[in-house]
Each structure stands twice: as structure tokens, then as C-alpha cells.
Amino acid sequence: MKLELDMFFLYGSTILPECILIFSLLIILIIDLTFPKKDTIWLYFISLTSLLISIIILLFQYKTDPIISFLGSFQTDSFNRIFQSFIVFCSILCIPLSIEYIKCAKMAIPEFLIFILTATVGGMFLCGANDLVTIFVSLECLSLCSYLLCGYTKRDIRSNEAAIKYLLIGGTSSSILAYGFSWLYGLSGGETNIQKITNGLLNAETYNSSGTFIAFICILVGLAFKLSLVPFHQWTPDIYEGSPTPVVAFLSVTSKIAGLALATRILNILFSFSPNEWKIFLEILAILSMILGNLVAITQTSMKRMLAYSSISQIGYILIGLITGDLKGYTSMTIYVFFYIFMNLGTFACIILYSLRTGTDNIRDYAGLYIKDPLLSFSLTLCLLSLGGLPPLTGFFGKLYLFWCGWQSGFYLLVFIALITSVISLYYYLKIIKLILTKKNNEINPYIQAYIITSPTFFSKNPIEFVMIFCVLGSTFLGIIINPIFSFFQDSLSLSVFFIK
């Protein structure tokens, strides 16, 4: 009996952060059904409190030894704890970004928070999924909530179109991924646990068969769709442009973090017997993403479409760390993902704030913004320059470590293209900054002329401005303490299943 209780508490502790979020979304659902006239402040309070408790628990658990629980379907180690913390952290920042937007768009608040929390839970389970069934169910939990969030502004035709496109593309990619899983299930003798599948393929000597190659291609294509890698990226700009901007901010980071954690686990465990092969394919996808993402971003007139192509190029940079395959490469990848959260969400906070005050996201309508709102102009400038990797901002140090690890591992062409495309990205970022900062009074557009600042002080009560300032500070000053951050993540990742011998 004592052994059973110990196992219960051990297994329960591995999914305690997820259980807290599930409990909170059930409370929100009950409140929504029970009280017709409810105070929305309490709903936000419950959501944010549960997320804060979850991330505190994750931070206490990040250095625990790897634990396989629930009959091998879930694995807890330092790698997935870090990525789960990133997902929860993104949700904490994205909920304040949505408060004013939801109020202006007259959207239902309880359902929105339920979808955000459910997507967060799905992403967290996906980071530690150790079984094909668990992977697929977690992925669909995240995906289905993403589709619903994209179409949440039901009165907006563009939002409905984005939701339908995302549903069709997402369903197709999930089907391709499931087809690849079915090949592995058959070739391994009916196993669903990813370690047992690898052992089954090695024991049956089918790891070099055409069936395994088909499974690998299908899984890689499915993952490439989820990560918006070229040439499987076509859906991304349309979804970014049509969906509510806070939803885009949420999906632009959480879906990539969860997808990256899944790709790392699958490629390092399922296909550990052929690392050179999958690295070649990933290198090609990363190069295409960096080149096409940055070149097409130059031609965009919408801020959200520009950020869509920018995110495509950013995931290309992040893949450099995964391709290197060693501890330093994974550490640099993790650091850049952490920095990317601040840079990307800071940029989206600026866009949300500007679109709420003007109703536009066209790049040319930002002309002369510095005259009316210096704080917003300064914040957007710093976030864009950090995304471009301009020293001495945070993005520069993230890219520096990433490129250096790739160069040390011998991926010279990959790093060279990354450097060239980073310079190209500075062009379209600086083009926007020039537009914001250099227009004269007689050239100001009508949107800026009618622009009204609701809270011009630095210490703002506006939650969007609070998140914006927080992310700007992270995008600007985190690079100063890059060495302690690198040591922290390196020590943590050294305890993950990928590096424990």
C-alpha cells in the first residue's frame, strides 16, 4: 500500500503543473455556467494565478532526474521542464495582451481563457510525451484550441477564413504525421513507446528499410508544417494576418516552442540511429526558411504578414542549435528561444497597442509615430533591432552563441547563410524604424493625426503597456548577463535524457 501511494505521489508530481491548469479551467467553466453576471477580473485572476503557480512548480522541478511515468507514456526531465516553463511564461504574458483587445472586440472572455489554458496544457504534455498516442493527442489538443482561437472574432470574415485555412492545413499535417507514426508502429512490431520503437527497429534490423525512410519523411513533413518551415510555410502569413492579434502573439511562440520540443525528442530518440540523415534534411529546411523568410518579408506591407515571414526565418536560426546535436548547441537553441519570447511578444505588444488606437496594421501607417507616442516608438524600435540581432541588444548575443556553436560543429555553410540573412533582416526592420522616426509633420498620415495616448507615463496601468515595457527590458538588457544564463541552461540540460550516459 505504501509503495502504491509513493508511486501515486511520484507520478502525480510529474504532471502537477498541468493538473493545476486543468483545475483552473474547470473552475472558469463552472463560474461561466453558474453565474450569468460575473466579474471578469476574477476570471483573469484565476487564469494568471494558476499559470504563476504552475511555472513556480516547474522552476522547482527543472533539475530533477529523468522520470518515466504512466506506463512509459510521459517522460519528465530538465529539457521538457524548461520548454514547459517557456510555454507557461508565454501564456502569462499573452493574457494581459488580450484584455483590452477582447473588450474592444466584444468577445466572450471565459471561453477565450479556457482555450488559452487548454492549448497551454496541450503544449506542456507535448513537451514530455513519450508515446505515439500521447504525442498525437497532445498535439491535437494544442491544435484544436489554436483553430478555435484563430476564428474567435466570429464577426470578422478574415478571422473565419484564417480559422478554416488553419483547420484544413493543420488537419492535413496531422494526418501526414499520423501516417508516419503508423509505419513505425508496424515496423517495430506494434510498439507505441518511442524508446521501444527504436529498440524494435534495431532488433529487427529494419532501421535502414524503405519503410523507415517513408516514416521519417512523413514525420519530418508533419513537423515542418507545425514549425512553419519552408516549403511548408504557405499557411503562416494568412493565419497571422486574419487571426486576432493577441492570438497570433500566443501562437507565434507557444506552437513553435511545443513543436521544437517535439521535434527534438522525436529526432533524438526515434531516429537516433541515423543522426547524419535527419541533420541533412533539417539543414536544407533551415537554409530555405532563412533565405525565403527574410527575402519575402522585405516586400510585405502588413506588420503581421511581415512578422509571419520573420518568424519563418527565426525558426531557421533556431534549428542551427538542434542540428549541431551537442550540449552547447542545445543550450544556445534554448537560450535563443528564451530571448525570442521577449523580442517577439514585445513587438506584438506594440502592434496590438497601435492597432487598438488606430485600427490599422499597415506598415506605412506607422509613419511619424514618434511625434505622438515616443514610448511606443522607442519600444518597437528596440524589439525590432533585437530581432535583427543588432549589438548590444539581447538578440545579438542569442545569435552570437547560436552561430558560434554551429561554426564549431562544422556547419559552415549553414552559419554563413544565417549571417547573410541576418543582415538582410536588418534592412526591413530598419525600413520600419526609419518610417516611424523620420517623417516630418506635413507627412503624417491621418491615423497618426487622430492618435490618442491614453496613458503617456512610463509606469502605466494599461496591461498591454506593462507587458510591452517588460519585454522591451528583456529584449534590451538580458544579453548583459548572457554568461550566467548560458551556464544555467547548460547545467540544466546536462541532466536531460539526451546527454545522460
UniProtKB/Swiss-Prot annotation:
Cytoplasm in keyword set: no
InterPro entries on file: NADH-Q_OxRdtase_suN/2, ND/Mrp_TM, Ndh2_N
GO cellular component terms attached to this protein's record: chloroplast thylakoid membrane
Annotated membrane topology: Multi-pass membrane protein
Enzyme class: translocase
Keyword NAD attached: yes
Annotated EC: 7.1.1.-
TM ranges: 15-35, 40-60, 82-102, 107-127, 132-152, 167-187, 212-232, 244-264, 278-298, 307-327, 333-353, 378-398, 410-430, 466-486
Subcellular locations according to the entry: Plastid, Chloroplast thylakoid membrane
GO biological process, one term: photosynthesis, light reaction
Keywords associated with the record: Chloroplast, Membrane, NAD, NADP, Plastid, Plastoquinone, Quinone, Thylakoid, Translocase, Transmembrane, Transmembrane helix, Transport
Top-level taxon in the UniProt lineage: Eukaryota
Catalytic activity annotation: a plastoquinone + NADH + (n+1) H(+)(in) = a plastoquinol + NAD(+) + n H(+)(out); a plastoquinone + NADPH + (n+1) H(+)(in) = a plastoquinol + NADP(+) + n H(+)(out)
Record's signal peptide: none
One MF annotation (Gene Ontology) recorded for this entry: NADH dehydrogenase (ubiquinone) activity
Its job: NDH shuttles electrons from NAD(P)H:plastoquinone, via FMN and iron-sulfur (Fe-S) centers, to quinones in the photosynthetic chain and possibly in a chloroplast respiratory chain. The immediate electron acceptor for the enzyme in this species is believed to be plastoquinone. Couples the redox reaction to proton translocation, and thus conserves the redox energy in a proton gradient.
Family: Belongs to the complex I subunit 2 family.
Quaternary structure, from the entry: NDH is composed of at least 16 different subunits, 5 of which are encoded in the nucleus.
Protein's UniProt name: NAD(P)H-quinone oxidoreductase subunit 2, chloroplastic
Gene symbol of the encoding locus: ndhB
